[in-house]
Amino acid sequence: MSNSDYLPDYPLNSDLVKRLKSALDAKDEERVRDLICTEITPVDAVIELANDDWMKDPSAQLPTGMLLGDLDHLKPLMDQFFQDANVVFEINKDEMEWQVKSPATFGLSGLWTLEYKRELTTPLCIAAAHGHTACVRHLLGRGADPDASPGGRGALHEACLGGHTACVRLLLQHRADPDLLSAEGLAPLHLCRTAASLGCAQALLEHGASVQRVGGTGRDTPLHVAAQRGLDEHARLYLGRGAHVDARNGRGETALSAACGAARRPDEHGRCLRLCALLLRRGAEADARDEDERSPLHKACGHASHSLARLLLRHGADAGALDYGGASPLGRVLQTASCALQASPQRTVQALLNHGSPTVWPDAFPKVLKTCASVPAVIEVLFNSYPQLCLSESWKEVIPEEVFQMHKPFYQSLFALALTPRCLQHLCRCALRRLFGKRCFDLIPLLPLPKPLQNYLLLEPQGVLH
């Protein structure tokens, strides 16, 4: 049953809902508990917290004649809001709502929807969402249905979203369905999305939740959700309960691929690295391709994550793999280098080249120079992977003047090599690297050479070229 089929016991304009919304907005937990436990009847009452149906209470007073093709109504609106008959409409997800042109909408105008959008809930869902354990116990004791979900999500879903383990356990003890699907096709395990929800996931599994259940339009398993969110402890729990480490979602991704593709804040990188190491130890395929033929290494390089790239390369990832678009991992990191300065993208380039990645076709080097000009360390590492590269003075034109001045010593040393053979030391480096091939990273540190010379062989950037 969709939420449009429910008749709320407490509609949006009722006095109780107004007081409840006021308490929720003010974060007055005591008042919320009091309203839920003492004033709302019956125990499974349907409460309407929002109603955006424009036909009932439109934010823009659109005349009904417009829907009927009434030209007399259409012309004034066209004259007032847009003159271009081919106006582009801004659509948010699957809905269109009327918007007047304004700087906030960047000049785009939206339209309207006939969809009946409401936010319906129950006292139990509200209590579970806010972690009011005593209130949940009280409502269940009065016979509240633990699986009621008039708004599309049940109390278990709400408790898991909030990471309220005690509420989850109470609901499960009262026979809540641990695999209840929301209107979006998500089970409670799919909503264990934060570190605080680990106890919720544990309780769900103890009560028979399926660790392999796919959900939502993405057809993700709980392990995919944990991987996308960088939740290493959740992943450990799911794997211990029999989750398939290389299960595919609707985009053809494994959990490892999903983990490598998710954007991370700097403080999340360590946790993501632990998660990926765990998946690889449990047998995850390091080179698994998704529907676009992208490997986990492609995705790690797309974020210039050198520590993650090195981890994958140590587990056998192919440094020269090509996706459907013909892009290699090296190509991916070069595309993102100028936007990921804090990630030290030269480290990722260095790791790929030391594990056998083909370098860039010489004729394409000016394009790389243009793209990565603001990251001279990337240019240095890549340039040193060629025994000899014919430079042209015309290449200076692709470097913005302010960038050239900011990194003047490096670019002066680069163009000083135009029409000049590289030094013997560099040519010896290239000969050794060609001999070791994709094992440079493993074999060069074994050579009886001083550390600075080993670093030189491994293309460690020095700031200038010789």
Swiss-Prot record:
- How is this protein annotated for GO cellular component? cytosol
Q: Does the keyword Repeat apply?
A: yes
Which InterPro entries has this protein been placed in? Ankyrin_rpt, Ankyrin_rpt-contain_sf, SOCS_box, SOCS_box-like_dom_sf
Q: In which pathway does it act?
A: Protein modification; protein ubiquitination
Q: Which UniProt keywords apply?
A: ANK repeat, Repeat, Ubl conjugation pathway
Name the Gene Ontology biological process terms: intracellular signal transduction; protein ubiquitination
The record places domain SOCS box at: 405-463
**Which CDD domains does UniProt cross-reference here?**
SOCS_ASB4_ASB18
One Pfam family it belongs to: SOCS_box
Q: Which PROSITE patterns does its entry note?
A: ANK_REP_REGION, ANK_REPEAT, SOCS
Q: Where are the ANK repeats?
A: 119-148, 151-180, 184-213, 218-247, 251-288, 292-321
Notes on the domains:
The SOCS box domain mediates the interaction with the Elongin BC complex, an adapter module in different E3 ubiquitin-protein ligase complexes.
| Function text | May be a substrate-recognition component of a SCF-like ECS (Elongin-Cullin-SOCS-box protein) E3 ubiquitin-protein ligase complex which mediates the ubiquitination and subsequent proteasomal degradation of target proteins.
So what family is this one in? Belongs to the ankyrin SOCS box (ASB) family.
According to UniProt, the name of this protein is Ankyrin repeat and SOCS box protein 18
- Gene encoding this polypeptide? ASB18
